Amino acid sequence: MFDRDETPAELPAGPGSAPDRPALEALLKARVPAPPADLQHALNHNQIACKTWLLDALFGTLGGRFGTVSLLGGWYGVLGALLLGDARFQVDRVLSYDIDPNCARVARGLNREHVAKGRFEALTADVCELDYTGLNGSSDGRAQGAAGNGAAGDGTQGADLVINTSCEHMAPTSAWYDGVPPGTLQVHQSNDYFDCPEHVNCVADLEAFKADLPMGEVLYQGSMARKRYTRFMLIGRK
């Protein structure tokens, strides 16, 4: 039986003044043809709370101006929609990578307006195989590395910010993290929800998370207690 944290999120009562409220409103009103059954899970209270926490901490730590933001394990593009719709942020584009080929269609649907403006793309890729020195989205929805098999001379530079909120789903961490260039700005989340079968790389606490993701400079570290688990977040430079 699901508790409230695992039910679909809704807008808070009252008009509200939070800068991310319009983004959440647009996201919850978005319609995707033949939506997958687990889309509601991607929009539940836990998911939205953890992503809102990320945006608040990101803005407070690094400000709101970014060029290219790469989302690893981006799933259905919920974080991308919230980021691009948040008035505090000026982001050129978001590239959302997920190994599941079924995610891209849904992510593009939730980010339809941003896709039309060239500010969002969902790409099917194994993040352990990405060339993080230069990421480029191809028109057919497959990931390409600008320093690898991307179009020569297209001027694409590496991501200004790399975000992975799915660290608990990816093991070992080194498989994807070793490819991120030193000095890269990054935001990562994990949790201690060991009882979830899909979580193959949980951490016991914030210190364990820091040990698993060694950063040259930690700019923010924090935890958020939820009913079934605690969420951990790190912001910094590799």
Language-model segment annotations:
Residues F2-R65, R105-T156:
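S-adenosyl-L-methionine
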Residues R65-Y76:
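Conserved class I S-adenosyl-L-methionine
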Residues Y76-Q90:
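Conserved SAM-binding loop of SAM-dependent methyltransferases across substrates and taxa
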Residues G158-T173:
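A short SAM/SAH-binding and catalytic strip from SAM-dependent methyltransferases
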Residues P172-L234:
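C-terminal substrate-binding/active-site "lid" region of AdoMet-derived donor-dependent transferases
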Residues V91-Y97:
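Short beta-strand element of Class I
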